[in-house]
């Protein structure tokens, strides 16, 4: 039976100094021997998805102490990808994931905490904390801040449901008046919470439900709704129970690595494909699996993507559907329920809250459950009042969305498509793979070919798009924006949004070794691996080269003779130290970013660090 980790600092004569310091934090004689639960909060006033978290750590702490534990809270950093977007601030977004993971590890291991509650929400915070939880492998529960309400506004005589991307697209569209842009801007992000569509933050919070590491509703109940408070209260009690089961009953089934098994990662990816989640989830699931020692690879994602239907389309894939609508249709448990009925789910896996996912579905899938509490829970509605306060309203829909033929969530027979919402493309331009969010691609361009328009940075591509130098039929190629080449693998939301603004969203393709925001739609192919800075084929593309894309056959081809490509590679390699570097790019790269670039790996590996590539380590 394992000892409580905290005994290292709380027991024995030689720990008198440590106990003295614990006492200075409020620990009393009778507390020594109780499990010490770390609360990793991520409150910041920079990020709307985290601005309401300040008091929620102490809410959880109070429940932990009621349950017989000792709660100790600390904070991590949190980058707002929307605010960091479109300038060099985006270089720091993906690297912040590793910094968050490390900071959680540092705090938990330095102070010998016994268990962990992760209060996350936005794009890199949930993945970073997930990586840390799997690295530490102590009892852990995730509870996120919850989604933002969708904006509502009268524009052009119509009532529109809005989000961040609508504001970006409208601002770059000359056909939209300044007055309408101002209305959209003021209405797009009305409350606290993670941006209201199926963007990266909400996608990852949904996936924690499928992995089994968070409570039902974690991914979908609104940040503003009073029902979300219950998740924080339950998390406080449950984490103490999990700690006791592990340390006092030797029950290793409650540990993150026991729960987040290979099959659990398959469940998470199956959900992601079915709901058309952000392409960034691929990067983060690969990284989390790496931390867990689970051999979940790009090939597994490719395999799953070929057999899972698209059961749910949410903004940006469907502009009038947001997370509040997904919740009304039964949330993530409803999507998992449809996948289970289709025979596409491993329902026998444990979760932090139930002996098996199947048992949880019997209670929480609204098509199976007769529980009045569950039915009421999924009727939680937006308050439609701008606020930065959590749990500030209690509105409910009169009825649930149970329509599985034409509703927000479909059954397999009435799927949006039998091909899922994400696909992995391979070919000579992406030998290790690339990712496209097929849920956001119009059917008319599932097969596409055109001349390459090559750019060495996101900035130069944006300039060309806004100047009207990109025309229908072009394939925009943005390279040297991968994990190492950026460094930091910037998101390309501005280029894709501006293509839509110019009426080219269904007439052009964009290919990059960078990545895309969860808000991206259109024929946007990211994570091209190997990246340009690693000598990938994307570095050899020249202006006007024909590029052929076929989502149905999962192919991405640079239609240039092999002999010519070999010649180009020889010319590039002859540059020596200057080979596989951007020709002209004005970019200040800090010491912190250079250190990140030195250790990061391909997007096909989740852009995790590889210390083995540096012999001195």
Curated annotation (Swiss-Prot):
Record bears the keyword Transmembrane helix: no
Residues with N6-carboxylysine modification: 124
Classification via Gene3D superfamilies: IlvD/EDD C-terminal domain-like (3.50.30.80)
Binding positions (Mg(2+)): 81, 123-124, 491
Residues of the active site: 517
Residues that coordinate or bind [2Fe-2S] cluster: 122, 195
Protein name: Dihydroxy-acid dehydratase
Record's catalysed reaction(s): (2R)-2,3-dihydroxy-3-methylbutanoate = 3-methyl-2-oxobutanoate + H2O; (2R,3R)-2,3-dihydroxy-3-methylpentanoate = (S)-3-methyl-2-oxopentanoate + H2O
PROSITE patterns: ILVD_EDD_1, ILVD_EDD_2
Organism phylogeny: Bacteria, Pseudomonadati, Pseudomonadota, Alphaproteobacteria, Hyphomicrobiales
Cofactor note: Binds 1 [2Fe-2S] cluster per subunit. This cluster acts as a Lewis acid cofactor.
Keyword flag Transmembrane helix: no
GO cellular component: cytosol
Entry keyword set: 2Fe-2S, Amino-acid biosynthesis, Branched-chain amino acid biosynthesis, Iron, Iron-sulfur, Lyase, Magnesium, Metal-binding
GO biological process, any: L-valine biosynthetic process
Origin: domain of life: Bacteria
InterPro entries cross-referenced by the UniProt entry: Dihydro-acid_dehy_C, DihydroxyA_deHydtase, DiOHA_6PGluconate_deHydtase_CS, ILV_EDD_C, ILV_EDD_N, IlvD/EDD_N
HAMAP family: IlvD
Pathway: Amino-acid biosynthesis; L-isoleucine biosynthesis; L-isoleucine from 2-oxobutanoate: step 3/4; Amino-acid biosynthesis; L-valine biosynthesis; L-valine from pyruvate: step 3/4
Known cofactor(s): [2Fe-2S] cluster; Mg(2+)
Gene Ontology MF terms: 2 iron, 2 sulfur cluster binding; dihydroxy-acid dehydratase activity; magnesium ion binding
């Amino acid at each position: 039976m394992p000892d409580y980790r905290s005994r290292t600092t709380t027991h024995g004569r030689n720990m008198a100094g440590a106990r003295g310091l614990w006492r200075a934090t409020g620990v009393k004689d009778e507390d020594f021997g109780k499990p010490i639960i770390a609360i990793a909060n991520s409150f910041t006033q920079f990020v709307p998805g985290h601005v309401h978290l300040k008091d929620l750590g102490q809410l959880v702490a109070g429940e932990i102490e009621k349950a017989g534990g000792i709660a100790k809270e600390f904070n991590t950093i949190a980058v707002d990808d929307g605010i960091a977007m479109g300038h060099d601030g985006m270089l720091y977004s993906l690297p912040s994931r590793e910094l968050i993971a490390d900071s959680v590890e540092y705090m938990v291991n330095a102070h010998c905490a016994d268990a962990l509650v992760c209060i996350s929400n936005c794009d890199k915070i949930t993945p970073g904390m997930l990586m840390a939880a799997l690295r530490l492998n102590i009892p852990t529960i995730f509870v996120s801040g919850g989604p933002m309400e969708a904006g509502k506004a009268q524009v052009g005589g119509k009532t529109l449901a809005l989000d961040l991307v609508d504001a970006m697209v409208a601002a770059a569209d000359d056909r939209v008046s300044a007055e309408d842009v101002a209305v959209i801007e003021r209405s797009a992000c009305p409350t606290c919470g993670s941006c209201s569509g199926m963007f990266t933050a909400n996608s990852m919070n949904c996936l924690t439900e499928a992995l089994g590491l968070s409570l039902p509703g974690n991914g979908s109940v609104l940040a503003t709704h009073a029902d979300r408070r219950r998740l924080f209260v339950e998390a406080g009690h449950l984490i103490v129970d999990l700690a006791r089961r592990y340390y006092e009953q030797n029950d290793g089934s409650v540990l993150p690595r026991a729960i987040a098994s290979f099959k659990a990662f398959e469940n998470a990816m199956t959900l992601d494909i079915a709901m058309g989640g952000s392409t960034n989830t691929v990067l983060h699931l690969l990284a989390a699996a790496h931390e867990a020692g689970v051999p979940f690879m790009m090939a597994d994602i490719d395999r799953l993507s070929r057999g899972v239907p698209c059961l749910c389309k949410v903004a940006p894939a469907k502009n009038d559907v947001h997370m509040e609508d997904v919740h009304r249709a039964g949330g993530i448990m409803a999507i998992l329920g449809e996948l289970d009925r289709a025979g596409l789910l491993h329902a026998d896996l444990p979760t932090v809250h139930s002996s098996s996912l199947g048992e949880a579905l019997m209670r929480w899938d609204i098509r199976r459950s007769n529980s009045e509490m569950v039915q009421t829970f999924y009727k939680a509605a937006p308050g439609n009042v701008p606020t930065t306060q959590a749990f500030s309203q209690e509105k409910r829909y009169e009825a649930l969305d149970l329509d599985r033929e034409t509703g927000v969530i479909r059954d397999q027979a009435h799927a949006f498509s039998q091909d899922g919402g994400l696909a992995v493309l391979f070919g000579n331009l992406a030998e290790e793979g690339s990712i496209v969010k097929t849920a956001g691609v119009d059917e008319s361009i599932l097969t596409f070919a055109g001349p390459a328009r090559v750019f060495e940075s996101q900035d130069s591509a944006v300039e060309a798009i806004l100047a009207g130098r990109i025309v229908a039929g072009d394939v925009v190629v943005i390279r040297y924006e991968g994990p190492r080449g950026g460094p930091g693998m910037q998101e390309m939301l501005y280029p894709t949004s501006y293509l839509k603004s110019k009426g080219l969203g269904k007439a052009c393709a964009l290919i990059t070794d960078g990545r895309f925001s969860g808000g991206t739609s259109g024929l946007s192919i990211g994570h091209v691996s190997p990246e340009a800075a690693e000598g990938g084929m994307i570095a050899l593309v020249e202006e006007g080269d024909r590029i052929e894309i076929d989502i149905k056959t999962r192919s991405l081809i640079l239609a240039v003779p092999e002999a010519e490509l070999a010649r180009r590679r020889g010319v590039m390699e002859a540059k020596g130290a200057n080979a596989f570097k951007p020709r002209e790019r004005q970019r200040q790269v800090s010491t912190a970013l250079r250190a990140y670039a030195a250790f990061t790996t391909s997007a096909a590996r989740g852009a995790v660090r590889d210390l083995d590539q540096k012999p001195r380590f």
